[in-house]
Amino acid sequence: MTSSDTTSPILITGATGRHGGTGAHLARRLREAGRSVRALVRRLDERIAPLQALGAEIVVGDLHDRASLVPALEGVGLAYFTYPVNGGIVQAAANFAAAARQVGGHARVVVMSNGASHPESPSHFGRAHWLAEEVLGWAGLDLLILRIASLFYENVPTAHGRSIRDEGVIRNCFGDARLTWISGEDAAEIGLVALLHPERFERGRVQYPPGAELLSHAEVARVLSEELSRPIRFEPITREAWRDELLALAEAQPGGAVNPDMADHISTIGAAVATAGKRPSQTADAAALQRLTGRAPLSFRSFVQKERERFLQAAREPSTLRSQHG
């Protein structure tokens, strides 16, 4: 089945995911395009309401339960595979691949990956993600892998929101490296193109789409200062110190987007980037991104303006974290 098959449902994993929200945005955009959406969710809770309002078909399943994926993939022509920065991605990919083969293995699968996905990545998650992609390929699935080698704007409130609000500081181990950035919505737009218009990409199973903007964390702090009307500064710290801070955040907010695997992954990547500088796969080209998706990408400044209340809200709440650096 191909993108020209407009009758079969498109399976969206991660449809209620929090960080980046690519699955939810993709579901909405597919429904706007008149496509049938089947959303895979782990449980029926309040997060499915927006999906139901869109007219999406809700299927309960878990990437760690192969049997639950069989009915989810039945009759599917296109599928979007995404997985949070967390443990278990290889098993999840194996379950997905086995279920896809059981129902015929005809679905074309778009994989939302990341620039750290590589067999020799310094990050354990990066190596695991690469292996998961290999597993999907070994199953004979028709893959288009999107290695987004950009940080999500959403990383800033997720990883640094409380320190920004409570202390006016961003702390991490990326140093003064200038990095490419993209919004979760624009990453989802790339996924939309991959599902419906794969011909817009160059030949090849693995793609490295461009980012929207090139910024150091000091520049990120400067934009925040201007938009939030208060001084925000960037403080470089060691990998170990940032990992400890992220682990404390994960402990204080169980079930949140930050978890021990994410803490290890982003602190490891931060240290590697600070040491090596800009990675070869990193490009920021807003014009090229617009040509690919058909819409102007969101800038970080526009993201902050859009999410201003998110940056300010918890300043009114008592802090559950204490700084480990002063």
Predicted segments — roles?
Residues 13, 82, 294:
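Residues lining the SAM
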Residues 73, 77-80, 110:
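N-terminal Rossmann-like NAD(P) cofactor-binding module of classical short-chain dehydrogenase/reductase
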Residues 2-50, 64-67, 85-87, 99-108, ...:
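Oxidoreductase cofactor-interface core, primarily capturing Rossmann-like NAD(P)-dependent enzymes
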Residues 93, 129, 157-161, 217, ...:
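A general structural signal for well-ordered alpha-helical segments in protein cores
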Residues 71-73, 91-104:
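Rossmann-fold NAD(P) dinucleotide-binding segment
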Residues 202, 243-326:
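A hydrophobic C-terminal alpha-helical subdomain
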Residues 57-59, 233-237:
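General small-molecule cofactor/ligand-binding pocket signal
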